[in-house]
């Protein structure tokens, strides 16, 4: 399970260093192979390949009225291999789709990651905190 936030920088070629705390798990779980695609909230999703295959199968089974979401998730998906230095290349198309500049935030979200432009993530997080807890969390105990 992946968790935690990491402040990272994309290099001039659009490569991102995977934090060392995740590298071993990605090597073991997916042989360093990941898939990156778009997320409806404006960030990117980064899946270890076995988790992507599960997600892809679920998306593929969506009904016809969700065809555009199939296009968004599957049509934008790119398979990437982690290089020897533990970096993954985020394609120019996906960087544009995710609004990624140089500074990014990688969030561990359990079985996958979200990749955000750092400023966008901070703004959205602050807005969510200002709104208060949603009803679904009202009975949640810390």
Curated annotation (Swiss-Prot):
PROSITE patterns the record matches: SPOVT_ABRB
Record-annotated SpoVT-AbrB domain positions: 5-51, 77-120
GO MF terms held by the record: DNA-binding transcription factor activity; transcription cis-regulatory region binding
Localization in the cell: Cytoplasm, Nucleoid
Keyword Membrane on entry: no
SUPFAM superfamilies (alphabetical): AbrB/MazE/MraZ-like
Record's signal peptide: none
CDD domains xref list: MraZ_C, MraZ_N
Gene Ontology cellular component list: cytoplasm; nucleoid
Swiss-Prot/TrEMBL keywords: Cytoplasm, DNA-binding, Repeat, Transcription, Transcription regulation
Disulfide linkage: none
Quaternary structure and interacting proteins, as annotated: Forms oligomers.
Family: Belongs to the MraZ family.
Record-linked PANTHER family: TRANSCRIPTIONAL REGULATOR MRAZ (PTHR34701:SF1)
Protein name: Transcriptional regulator MraZ
Organism (species): Paraburkholderia xenovorans (strain LB400)
């Amino acid at each position: 399970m992946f968790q935690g936030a990491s402040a990272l920088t994309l290099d001039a070629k659009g490569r991102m260093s995977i934090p060392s705390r995740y590298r071993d798990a990605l090597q073991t779980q997916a042989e360093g192979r990941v898939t990156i695609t778009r997320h409806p909230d404006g960030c990117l999703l980064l899946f270890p390949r076995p988790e992507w295959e599960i997600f892809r199968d679920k998306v593929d089974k969506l009904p016809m009225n969700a065809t555009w979401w199939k296009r968004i998730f599957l049509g934008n998906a790119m398979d990437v291999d982690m290089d020897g230095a533990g970096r993954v290349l985020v394609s120019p198309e996906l960087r544009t789709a995710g609004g990624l500049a140089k500074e990014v935030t990688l969030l561990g979200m359990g079985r996958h990651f979200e990749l955000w432009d750092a400023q966008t993530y901070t703004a959205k997080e602050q807005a969510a905190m200002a709104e208060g807890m949603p009803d679904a969390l009202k009975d949640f105990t810390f």
